[in-house]
Structure formats: structure tokens, C-alpha cells
Amino acid sequence: MDSKDESSHVWPTSAEHEQNAAQVHFVPDTGTVAQIVYTDDQVRPPQQVVYTADGASYTSVDGPEHTLVYIHPVEAAQTLFTDPGQVAYVQQDATAQQTPLGGLEAKEEEDEDEDEDTEEDEEEDGEDADLDDWEPDPPRPFDPHDLWCEECNNAHSSVCPKHGPLHPIPNRPVLTRARASLPLVLYIDRFLGGVFSKRRIPKRTQLGPVEGPLVRGSELKDCYIHLKVSLDKGDRKDRDLHEDLWFELSDETLCNWMMFVRPAQNHLEQNLVAYQYGHHVYYTTIKNVEPKQELKVWYAASYAEFVNQKIHDISEEERKVLREQEKNWPCYECNRRFISSEQLQQHLNSHDEKLDVFSRTRGRGRGRGKRRFGPGRRPGRPPKFIRLEITSENGEKSDDGTQDLLHFPTKEQFDEAEPATLNGLDQPEQTTIPIPQLPQETQSSLEHEPETHTLHLQPQHEESVVPTQSTLTADDMRRAKRIRNAALQHLFIRKSFRPFKCLQCGKAFREKDKLDQHLRFHGREGNCPLTCDLCNKGFISSASLESHMKLHSDQKTYSCIFCPESFDRLDLLKDHVAIHINDGYFTCPTCKKRFPDFIQVKKHVRSFHSEKIYQCTECDKAFCRPDKLRLHMLRHSDRKDFLCSTCGKQFKRKDKLREHMQRMHNPEREAKKADRISRSKTFKPRITSTDYDSFTFKCRLCMMGFRRRGMLVNHLSKRHPDMKIEEVPELTLPIIKPNRDYFCQYCDKVYKSASKRKAHILKNHPGAELPPSIRKLRPAGPGEPDPMLSTHTQLTGTIATPPVCCPHCSKQYSSKTKMVQHIRKKHPEFAQLSSTIHTPLTTAVISATPAVLTTDSATGETVVTTDLLTQAMTELSQTLTTDYRTPQGDYQRIQYIPVSQSASGLQQPQHIQLQVVQVAPATSPHQSQQSTVDVGQLHDPQPYPQHAIQVQHIQVSGQPLSPSAQQAQQGLSPSHIQGSSSTQGQALQQQQQQQQNSSVQHTYLPSAWNSFRGYSSEIQMMTLPPGQFVITDSGVATPVTTGQVKAVTSGHYVLSESQSDLEEKQTSALSGGVQVQPPAHSDSLDPQTTSQQQTTQYIITTTTNGNGSSEVHITKP
């Protein structure tokens, strides 16, 4: 029998085995064949795979150069030749025996002389073929080592000598539990071991739990990582244990795939953290795992202490590597990398500021009907490239010196440009910027050495202006080269730019490495992997050969999508499809859709009605074109490489960014929006209808009613943007929101919001159908069930919340969070100030005590923030709960301005300092009384609480203080509050004269101001407004100007809640020695004191929170 034939019977041969086989050894005499197959040529230690006659395979990682496996024909024992002089017989009971090797020399001689082997095999074949005189053996008794032959009806010690060997069909290999439980996104390397990722796994992804038998610590075997499980007292008692157990992760049949995850040696290669949660141990990713990256685990901080291990500390080198890995946004000008695109954009702006040659100033010049920057570029848009032409000494242009400079325009430069710039109206046809001769050491660093360099800028328009001159240094030239490289790389990425072309076949490539790899096939002198049988032309891939074979076939390649006709040329097909035009349109043969162009219907058929053979590996979607599949795969990716330079929004696809720019940042849309805001619209009031009064929310200007509060707010913001919220009483009512319970239809969980229920279903019930949204429900038709039943919600009540108004428009929301989101979206310029926004207060602050301030700072009084409006709203809001009232943290700015009638005599003081040392709630002494205020007189019906502000002292700087003031400044306490004397009143008059043009200070009282501020208040300096209001006795408010001040003839400086309260305060003021009297008693007073009273007034003005001064008409009650 031929040895080759015997080998084919014994071995499962394949093309792969024949290519990889290194040697085939034939064991002499009665032995069978053993074959050595070496692995592929990868960069690994020398490995050998040995295939034996029984179909099994053995791998030797660090084995000898030659390994032979011999199957003994009689004893069925494996013989392993490990030493040239020894033979190891591996019996079936796994015992080994070393014996001297006697037949190895004969075997090697036969291997050296192949002809002799062939002759001996042919002789054996001749002997085996002579079976004419063969007689069956007598029946043999049962022996488990004999092979049964059904044809002979007898057993043989080996292969049947007459009928030959059997044709075995081996069992299908069954994976172990550990390998079968491996997730689809992971794979196990069969050579290196360890678990690797097929695709990107994001951070904070949980894997597990770990499965395997639990053993004691003394029974642990050698494995990758040791994991300990903390057991409860009940579990220990049930198992009769006194210690915690460990996972035994050495048996693939009992564990899951997590036994193959190898431990990390340092913090840099660690991407998983192990911890115990409940009765299970999980792995969680601590960083993004990239494709083909190995998963490596180490213990969490608390779990490491539990298993007596140390966590991996981050070294300084690892910290630098991690910092560089996080920077995924490179700058192609200075080779720096940044973490985010915003940082990269800010860095690029710094490059634009440094480059003075390409700086552009703002202007308004835009040409009409002029030449554009190539096809498809809008007028006024800057050129993408600036051509740098280096002129030699004799004036000739050098082609080698041409460089393309990439310009990065900012948004302002994009909008407007001045005439003398690149986008101006008047531009020369060629702007020349001469550059002086560079030093010799600088010239040697450049590619060219001309004496004069000229920078020629390609103009946009044809008019001429005075040339702009500047100088370029060696750094600018090197930077120009970097910009050119960045421009080339930009073209490689963004466009189908293939500059590297093969001169032999005309194929083009984007990278030079690809071209070099392609040229290797041309250098093989026609030895390409695939060859055409008709023209002997070689090809690299089967796709290239398949497309080439169409040239030799008679099959026509261009088929009509409307009929069975086909053509061998594209122009014939285009001429043919004209007969399928019906009324100027092409009709899709499948869906009857109509298209005006053949290209459109062709794309439609190819996109929607072709066979979808490209399957997505992440989901069940399939596509008919590979480019559509590539676009779809971006949905499963977290990268957003396309950034909107206007608003900062990021997109995964370039076409989505283009649609966003056309839809949101279209210049026509921006112009219409600006025009709509500036144009005032006139409305004709509608006729009063019978249904107008039935609406709760009404617009009294348009005579329109609205069912919901938000409809009225939107109407006011669009139709009446100048109208204030305070002018609409309905918008000051609390917002009523429904309170619902959201039930999970798959378990007994209940949530307070639909978003939390949705997150619960996605996490705990994957694949389950989500309940419909309440906002998208449609009213049920006749005979249909209520659609609210399908939402699995229940109304439990309502919640009333005070409205939160936007300080920049008329919008109002039920929570501050939504208002802040509105500001960030609609008012981005005020987004930084959104954290300091409070509900605006517009009520006047009217003192409840005589407004007498003395020069010694020991005197003080309490100013109560109460007036008619506050009193009325307090009485009206008594029925509301405390949830609807404004909290105590709401504040006002209070301004005290002493005004003098005489403008001569003393030096002008510089500032008046008002220091507030205490803020406390103030209760009205007549809360139990019935309201005496007409509701129709209210201008601001918002309820606010009353506060008492205790003024400790007023200090006037710019002139020497009186001795009493100096003494009070040294020791000041609220107990020094007392009435004023005549001396104090005189000093007060001197301090308060000449105050009309001086600066005053406002006291700013934010909410929770005592919690974070170590001093009493925050002082802000503000100038005196030109007109104010003075409290007078006649009930008419008079504006105070610089040249005219009305004297106060009455001593009533305070507006009280009622007349009885006013009389009580007047009595207490007179008994305290206050030198303020009505004019009827002026004869009994000191003339100097009376003069002081007539020349001193006090102005009390309120200012809302950042919205300007609110001058209130103040009169006596």
C-alpha cells in the first residue's frame, strides 16, 4: 500500500493542512502515521500542533523542534518521542514508561531515502492487493480492544484486512460552560488566552456575575484571580461554616466565561474592577474598552481590603499616559492634543490671533454680482485656502514653493469683513506682501532660499486698494508648512481626495502606505494571487477578478429597472429609459412613486426595493448598500466628530450637521427672526363674545380667552412682548399641576414620573413594550375605549406651586429648573447669571417709624417693608398655605437719600454708607382687622412677606465726623438706639446738605445671606438718579431734581397702616425728643431746629432685582 494513500485514509486532510504542514513522519513497520503541523507565521513563541491518527490534536507551546506522536497499533498507546534516545509510552491509564529507542535510526534513514520508502510501500500494496485466496478467520471471543467488522461478521485486532478501514464521522464538539457563556461582544484568544472585546464597551458597564463552585480557602487551586464571597450568618449556619468561601475558577465545565479574565498588573492596563454586590461578584468597566483590547480586572478599594490585597496605585508615568489618552482632539498646527472640542477651538483661536498676516477686521462690505470663490461658495464667505507663492530672485515663480494655507475664520469674521480684508468689496487682483531677506541660518532651514519672498493672496473681487505690507519670519514659514499638512489631512478625511496614484494601473489611494502595499503586487512579475484564464492578467482580490471577467463575458451589464432590457453601455441605457416617461415622470415599478429624474428613481429602487444583504451586527436591520450600513453603524457608536461652530452641538454624521446648519443657522431664518422681534404688530380687538368671560386666562387687549395658562403666556410673548406679567392678574395665580402615579405593568413598582418608570422598564424588563405617552394620546372615537387606560397611570391629586418668571421675557414656569433651562436655550448671554436669579419684587418700601437719622451712629431705627399693596396681598393670601408664599430669602434693594434744600455752606461729602445688620420677619399689628384696601387699586397682586431691616448706623465720609459719631464708631450696639436731640439734628442737617449729586450705597440682601457671609451685608455703590420721589404732607409725590427741591413742611415722614397707628407713632416720637413738628407748632420751636426740619427731606426708593429703578407714587393714607 502506498504510504501517501495510507496517510490520506488516516488523516483528515484539507488545503489548510497541506499549506501549513511542515513534516510528515512515517513510523516504521506496523506503526501508523504522525503528522506535525506548524502554526501560522505570527509573532509568537514557537508553537506546534500535532494531529494524530484518531483525529485528536495536541499543542506544544514551548516544545522541542520536532515532536512525534506514535499510535501503537496493538496496545492503542500513544508514543511520544521527546528525546532522540528515549521513547515515552503513554498508556491508556495515563501512565508513562521510558524505554530506549531502537528503531529511530531506521526511521530517519527511511526519511532520508524517499525512493526506498516508495518501493517498500508499493511492495506492501502488492501483497495487500492479493486477496483472492483470503479466507475468513474463525470467530474470536469478545475483546474490547478488537475492531468489529460487520461484513466479515467478525472482530479484528486492527483494520479489517479485506474491507479496509472504516469511514468515521466524529461527534460535533461541544463547548464547555465557560466558553458557551461568553457574550457576543467578547472573544477568547486561542493562543494568548484572555478575554478581548470585539467592539467598544463604554465606561460603567457591568459584567457578570461570576459563576463557579464555592470552596474553602485551603481547597483553592491555581487560577487567574481569587475571589472571595462574604456570606451572611444564616448562610454560614446552613452550610455549617465558620469562614467565608472562595470561587474555584479552574474548571471550565463548572464556571462561566469570567474565569478567563486575567488580572491587571498595574493601574494603566486595568479596565475592570471586581466587587461583591449581594451574594454575587461582578465586574464593572472603569474606562472605555476599545475593540481588540483585553479585559483585565483588579479588586475594588473596599473589596481589596476584604481579600487582603492592595489596589494598584497610579504612578506619575501612568498618570501622564492616561492624561494623553484622554486627549482625543489634536491640533495640526502645534501637535498639541486636547480633551474636548471646545478646548481645541479656543486653542485654534489663539493661533488666529497670533497670525497678523491673516487677521481680518470687522466691516460691512459685501459685493453683489461679483466672482465667487469657486463653485458652491456663498458671497462674503472667506476662502478655504490662501496660496503662498515664493518668487525667486529673477522674478520667476517657483512651483515647488507653492503651499496651501488653511484659514480658520471665526463666527464674527464669517458674518462681516472690512473692505481692506480678504472679503472686502475693493480688492486688488493680486495683493503682494514683500518679505525681507531672511538670515542665512533661517534660509538653510527652509526648502528654498530666495532673497525675496512674496505672499500672493488670491482676491475675491476685482477692485484695487492700497496693498497691505507685513513681514513673515521663519516661524511663520514653518507654521505655513504645518498648515499645509493640516490642509492635506483635512482633505484626506473630509473628501475623496486620493493623491497617490499607481502609474501602472491607474488606481489611486489616500495614503502612501496603501500605494506602497499596492506596488508590491506589481513587483512580483505577474505572480498575483488570482489570474484571469483568458488573458493571464493578475489580480489582487476576487472582486477585481470578478469585475474583470465581465469584460470577457457576453452578458450585458446595464439593465433597465422598468423592463427586462439590458445594454452593454451606459449611454444606451440612458437613451432607452426615455420610453418609460409618463407625463414627464418616472414611476417606480414597485410602489408607484413618481420621480422627475431617472437618477432619483434609480436611487429609490436601489435603496428601498433591492435585496438587503448587508446585515448590521448590532441589531436586526439590513441594508442593500454598504455605505448605508456604514452610516447606520454610527448609531451604535458614541463618537460625535462633527461640531457646529455656532451653537456647539455635536453630530455623528456630516449630513446631519449640514441639515442642522441649513435649518437652524440659515441667514434668512436669522434675519426673519430678528425682523419679527423688532417689528411691532398691530392687532384689532375682537368683538366681545359670550364665551370670553367663561375663560380663566384672558388677554384684555385682544379680547381673547385661553383654556390653559401656557397658551396665554405664549400669546403675550409673541403678540405683546412689552407687556409685563404684573399687568395680568391671572398669571400671578399659583400653577396647578396634576400629581400622578405611574405603574409598571410588568411588576408591582410605582413611580412618580414617567421617565423613572421608563428607565425601570428598560433596565429590568428589556424588550418589553413601553406604555404610550400621555402627551401623544388622541381623543377616543365613538365606541372606542378610553386611551388613558393604556398609560397605566392614576391621578392622585394636584400640586399648586408659585410661578417662576423669566427675568428676560414674559415666560413663566412651575419650577426654577425649567426656567434655567429656558434661559440657557433662549437667553444664552445671561446663562452665567441664571444661578443668581430670584423672583422679582416691585413693592415699595415705606418706613413704619419716623425717618429721623442722627449723626451719632448709636441711633438707629427699624424699617418695615410694608405698604398698602403688601398689606392687601397679605390679607388676600391668608387662605393660601405657606407653600404659595414667597420665602423669606426674597429681597429688595433699599435706597435712602438725604436731600438738602440749600446747596451752599459745607463741603460735599463723598459717600453715605448704610449698613444693615439684621433682617427679621415683621408682623403687622393689625392682621386680625378686616381689609380696608380696594382690590382694584392693586398693581402687583403677588403676595410677599414683611421684613424688618434694622439700620445700625449711617456713616458719612468725605468730611470729619462729629465727636459723638467718632465715639459711636468705636463702640456700637443696637442698644444705643434713641431719639434725636437738637444738636444731633443740626449735625444731621450739615451732613445731609449737598447730597444731590453724591453717590449712595445700596444694601443687597440675598436669600440665606447669613449662611455664607461672615460680614453683615454686601455693599454696592450706585449713582444718584436724576429724579426721585419725596414723601410730602400734601399727598402728591414730587420728583426731586438737581435744581429744584420742595421743602417738607410737615413732620409726618411715615405712612402707617391706619390713622390710629400713625397717631400712636407721632406721640411716641414727640415723647422721645424728636425735633420734627408740624408747621402749626413751629412758633414754639427753636428757629434753628425749624430751619433744619424745613431743609431736610428723606427719599425712600425701591429697586427691583436687577431690572432698574422702580419709582413708586407714595402718599399719605
From Swiss-Prot:
**InterPro entries in alphabetical order:** PRDM10_PR/SET, SET_dom, SET_dom_sf, Zinc_finger/UBP_domain, Znf_C2H2_sf, Znf_C2H2_type
Location of the region described as Disordered in the Swiss-Prot/TrEMBL record: 97-142, 361-386, 440-474, 919-943, 958-1001, 1066-1094
UniProt GO BP? methylation; positive regulation of DNA-templated transcription; positive regulation of transcription by RNA polymerase II
Bias kind Polar residues: ranges? 924-934
GO molecular function terms attached to this record: DNA binding; DNA-binding transcription factor activity; methyltransferase activity; zinc ion binding
Write down a Pfam family by its short name: zf-C2H2
Residue positions where Phosphoserine is found in the record: 398
- Would you name any one GO CC term? chromatin
| Superkingdom of source | Eukaryota
The segment(s) forming the SET domain are 182-300
Q: Does this UniProt record's set of keywords contain Glycoprotein?
A: no
Note the zinc finger regions (C2H2-type) by start and end residue: 329-351, 500-522, 530-552, 558-580, 586-609, 614-636, 642-665, 697-720, 742-765, 804-827
Spans annotated as N-terminal PR domain: 201-305
Q: Which segments show compositional bias classed as Basic residues?
A: 361-381
* Residue numbers carrying Phosphothreonine: 402
**Residues of crosslink Glycyl lysine isopeptide (Lys-Gly) (interchain with G-Cter in SUMO2)?**
354
User: What are the alphabetically sorted keywords of the record?
Assistant: Activator, DNA-binding, Isopeptide bond, Metal-binding, Nucleus, Phosphoprotein, Repeat, Transcription, Transcription regulation, Ubl conjugation, Zinc, Zinc-finger
Stretches the record annotates as C-terminal glutamine-rich region: 871-1097
Q: Report the locations given in the UniProt record.
A: Nucleus
Basic and acidic residues: which segments have biased composition?
446-464
Q: Where is the composition biased (Acidic residues)?
A: 107-136
What does the record's free text say on domains?
The SET domain is degenerated, suggesting that it has lost methyltransferase activity.
Q: What does this protein do?
A: Transcriptional activator, essential for early embryonic development and survival of embryonic stem cells (ESCs). Supports cell growth and survival during early development by transcriptionally activating the expression of the translation initiation factor EIF3B, to sustain global translation. Activates the transcription of FLNC.
Q: Which family does it belong to?
A: Belongs to the class V-like SAM-binding methyltransferase superfamily.
This one is known as PR domain zinc finger protein 10
What organism does the record attribute this protein to?
A: Pongo abelii
Gene that produces this protein: PRDM10
